Amino acid sequence: MRRLTALLAALLLLAFTGCAANPAQPESTSSPAQADETQADFQVESAYPLEYAKEFTVDECTGGTRLITIQNARYLVVPENSTVPNGLSEDITVLQKPLENVYLVSTSAMDPILKLDARSAVTLSGTSAENWYLPEAKEAMENGEISYAGKYSAPDYERIVSANCGLAIENTMIYHTPEVKEQLEKFGIPVLVERSSYESDPLARMEWVKLYGILFDKEAEAETFFNEQVQRIRPLLGQDTTGKTAVFFSVTSNNLVTVRKSNDYVAKMIGMAGGEYVFSDLSDNGNNLATINLSLEEFYADAKDADVLIYNSTIEGKIETTEQLLSKCPMLADFKAVQNGNVWCTTQSLFQESMELPDLILDMNRVFTAESPNAVNEDELKFLTHVS
């Protein structure tokens, strides 16, 4: 252990010295250069079929390899006991199976991994046990099957290296600390930055399960799971709107109201469920954020007459009563939905349960189609609870 600690200390000193001499460069936003496959030992044979996802692509290549492209990053997934092709372009990161002792920083990636029964591949977490809302992930950490290895900006390099980490799965927050990504790669740990949160279609977000199927040899399971989830909401697709208007929001501590943009996946789920999103013209304002903060006056003007209010507990905490809601924002007492008792609150697990979006769509459909809030059978709801 002392030799390992000394080695890690030396490696860290060398790595940080390198960082001082070579500052991290900004992440390029240009599309990736194509590999010169005429000089490599593999060829692209066909495109892996994806129906909805736009933020990643997969090419099926010779020798059973898969070439994954996520924005401007490329990853070649090589089967176990297979030789890595020669002549690869320098921008391609090799992921040699089996991928074990994964350092999982992106919380939205845990749910698809759990659904594929691939949790044993994850032994390191960037989220502490108390911040997991997925019972299996929380229990695995409490039982010592998964160790906390530091958040995205401050990983425990010694723990990660000593665990023989085979892959770090990050989200785009890592680009705020590019030196961390660089350090992990200097230790020989490939870093995959997933972008499922940039998908504007709920089905596209769920289709990322296919990427994890490729990484963890669960392709058939991923296809089956995804198709089953799509079938659950297919009866709702193409149906006429219920005419119910809805708002998905939360109130910040500094008296602003956070709502989803009109092109966001939550707004699209409201439409799939038969509702009409109140902020249908709230388009992009030049950043990649899915939300926007409105003043109380702006929110009041547009949302006062909404039929249904859905409070997002994942940001500012859960509310159970109208009194709690009004303590956050007294002016909501004037709102039609508050006066009619048609206010609902999400569970705090909502965004970590990234593969259960059909349940939220079905929950909202039950609310939108009910004759009154009291007619909704709450035992049938997974993500929504009635604010009494």
Predicted regions and their residues:
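A short, structured surface patch at a secondary-structure boundary
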Residues: 70, 76-161, 167-174
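Positively charged n-region of N-terminal signal peptides that target proteins for export
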Residues: 1-12
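Structural recognition of the beta-strand scaffold that forms the well-ordered cores
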Residues: 101-104, 121-125, 167-171, 191-194, ...
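Extracytoplasmic ligand-binding site segments that recognize negatively charged/polar headgroups
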Residues: 100, 108-114, 125-136, 176-179, ...
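C-terminal motif of bacterial Sec signal peptides marking the signal peptidase cleavage site
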Residues: 13-18
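Structured C-terminal subdomain patch of bacterial secreted/periplasmic proteins
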Residues: 199-231, 308-388
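Flexible, glycine-rich surface segments
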Residues: 238-323
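Bacterial Sec-exported substrate-binding components of ABC uptake systems
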Residues: 19-110, 220-248, 372-388
